[in-house]
Amino acid sequence: MKIPNIRLQNQQLLNPLFCQPKELVSWLGAMQAQNYSMVKWAVGMRLKSATIQTVEEALRKGEILRTHVMRPTWHLVAAEDIRWMLKLSARRIKSANDSFAKGYNLEITDELYAKSYNLLEKILCGNKSLTKQEIAEHFCCSGILVEADNHRMTRFMVRAEQEGIVCS
């Protein structure tokens, strides 16, 4: 077999093996998912038979997760794999997050991160889903943020992902 065909087969683009998005994503380990619309197509085209709704349903149910598990880039991972992956990568991601924050003079104390985690748990309790902007409004009302600052808000959310508190 030629190398291009082996690659297509391993990427599940030739004779796909899986029917469900979570099976595929788990088998691959992770899929880069920076562009949300395109990653749904990327998953769907690697399944035996799927629609965009099949992939959206797996995301909505939390069977596959879109998160920053490997680096500050979005990836899809199977829900059952997220904890062990976070254990492997969280320290490095936290370090990169902190370095980025310092570069923008956005140093955030551990105390403030802890306060943000408590608020996130409170406002997202019961599988509630909020946008980053809606969460930022809660952070402003509670005094965690003085104003809705996207860079600072991103630091809070990336750190909360690494702690396993939220998953996008």
Regions found by a protein language model. Give the residues of each.
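Nucleic-acid-contacting surfaces of polymerase cores and analogous helical-repeat interfaces
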Residues: F100-L106, E161-S168
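Short, hydrophobic-biased segments on the C-terminal half of alpha helices
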Residues: V55-E56, T154-V158
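Phosphate-backbone binding and catalysis cores of DNA-processing enzymes
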Residues: M1-D149
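Hydrophobic mid-domain F-helix/FG-region of cytochrome P450s
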Residues: D149, A160-E161
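Toprim catalytic domain recognition across nucleic-acid enzymes
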Residues: V146-T154, V166
